[in-house]
Amino acid sequence: MDKKELFDALDDFSQQLLVTLADVEAIKKNLKSLVEENTALRLENSKLRERLGEVEADAPVKAKHVRESVRRIYRDGFHVCNDFYGQRREQDEECMFCDELLYRE
């Protein structure tokens, strides 16, 4: 291999290294962007989980209160089922639709 071929090979290798370096820099920039997005999403996820915990803690209390209100309306002699809601139950007779609603899990 003469000096010119050696110089050309070294020059080609140098050019390939520059292209590879540019690719690595682009990958680093993309990775930095992804890490920042990931950090933001983790923070948002953490806040949402915290908020969900607060909402779930309040939910059983509200559900119990609503269920008690519906039972009280039924005991007062009114239908709570979808078919006859708000109508007075004649002689406080049982309604299977209301019972299903009141005692479902």
Curated annotation (Swiss-Prot):
A cellular component term, taken from the record's GO annotations: nucleoid
Record carries keyword Glycosyltransferase: no
Broad class of the protein's primary localization: cytoplasm
Name of a matching Pfam family: YabA
Signal peptide: none
Cellular compartment(s): Cytoplasm, Nucleoid
Keywords from the UniProt entry: Cytoplasm, DNA replication, DNA replication inhibitor, Metal-binding, Zinc
Cofactor comment: Binds 1 zinc ion per subunit.
Residues that, per the record, bind Zn(2+): H79, C81, C95, C98
Regions annotated as coiled coil: none
Needed cofactors: Zn(2+)
Phenotype of null mutants: Increased DNA replication initiation rate. Reduced growth rate.
Example of a GO biological process term: DNA replication initiation
Function: Involved in control of chromosome replication initiation. Inhibits the cooperative binding of DnaA to the oriC region, thus negatively regulating initiation of chromosome replication. Inhibits the ability of DnaA-ATP to form a helix on DNA; does not disassemble preformed DnaA-DNA helices. Decreases the residence time of DnaA on the chromosome at its binding sites (oriC, replication forks and promoter-binding sites). Tethers DnaA to the replication machinery via the DNA polymerase beta sliding clamp subunit (dnaN).
Assembly notes: Homotetramer. Interacts with both DnaA and DnaN, acting as a bridge between these two proteins.
Protein family according to the UniProt entry: Belongs to the YabA family.
This protein's name: Replication initiation control protein YabA
Organism annotation: Streptococcus pneumoniae serotype 2 (strain D39 / NCTC 7466)
